[in-house]
């Protein structure tokens, strides 16, 4: 369970999040809203990349507000960036071992790659460099998160910068993660297909919460108001 209590965040004289209070308690939650609504800021606050100006953040009842990124990672929080980092000179197997916190066998690493739809023999010894596409990198990143076995996995707009074929594969990966999830998954996204596989949807606009509830209640309203009138929180 993740809880925001009166959380605000300001930068450069601008209020980006304003007194946000919400409890995310389902296995798979999606956060959506127009550009500049505070979605990515909320994700970075969860991961500890930035600290709130005001308010507190709790995970499973523990105050994590002042924890560093490392401490949050050790507490079971993982974060996937919009653009995964490339590591020249490090193989996919090495990266999975680093994520798992132990030396993984070839069989174990191959299992994690297979879970995200990658042919293990084609990737296990490849370097995580510019030869990999955006879609391949994102799936390798998800394999790392699965290897780590985190309590809370946060994905910031995972569909960004990938082609349609890679996106379709990514949807299948998230559907499988949803079915097998041992922890919470939070995805920041605009994509209807991602929103449609969430348990709950949180809608942000102008730094505040417009709506939050079960997917079956919130999703139809989002589809009816793509003109923008839904996102009118002052």
Annotate each predicted stretch with a short phrase.
Residues 2-4, 15-19:
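Conserved structural motif at the start of ABC-family nucleotide-binding domains
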Residues 32-34:
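The feature captures the beta-strand-to-loop junction immediately N-terminal to the Walker
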Residues 47:
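Helix-to-loop junction immediately C-terminal to a conserved catalytic motif
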Residues 55-62, 108:
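Conserved ABC transporter NBD signature motif
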Residues 63-78, 222:
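ABC ATPase NBD coupling module
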Residues 83, 89-105:
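Q-loop/switch helix immediately C-terminal to the Walker
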Residues 154-158, 165:
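Walker B catalytic motif
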Residues 208-231:
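Conserved beta-strand-loop-alpha-helix hinge in the C-terminal portion
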């Amino acid at each position: 369970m993740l809880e925001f209590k009166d959380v605000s965040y300001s930068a450069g004289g601008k209020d980006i999040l304003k007194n946000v209070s919400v409890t995310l308690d389902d296995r798979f939650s999606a956060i959506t809203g127009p550009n500049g609504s505070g979605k990515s800021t909320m994700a970075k606050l969860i991961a500890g990349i930035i600290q709130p100006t005001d308010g507190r953040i709790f995970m499973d009842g523990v105050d994590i507000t002042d924890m560093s990124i490392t401490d949050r990672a050790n507490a079971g929080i993982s974060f996937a960036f919009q653009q995964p980092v490339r590591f020249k000179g490090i193989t996919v197997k090495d990266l999975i071992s680093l994520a798992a916190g132990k030396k993984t066998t070839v069989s174990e690493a191959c299992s994690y790659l297979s879970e995200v739809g990658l042919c293990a023999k084609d990737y296990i010894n490849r370097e995580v460099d510019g030869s990999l596409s955006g879609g391949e990198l994102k799936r390798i990143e998800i394999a790392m998160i699965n290897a780590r076995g985190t309590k809370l996995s946060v994905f910031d707009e995972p569909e960004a910068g990938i082609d349609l074929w890679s996106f379709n594969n990514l949807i299948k990966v998230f559907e499988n993660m949803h079915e097998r999830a041992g922890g919470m998954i939070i995805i920041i996204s605009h994509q209807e297909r991602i929103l449609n596989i969430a348990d709950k949807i949180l809608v942000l606009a102008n730094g505040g919460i417009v709506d939050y509830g079960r997917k079956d209640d919130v999703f139809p309203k989002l589809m009816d108001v793509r003109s923008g009138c839904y996102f009118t929180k002052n």
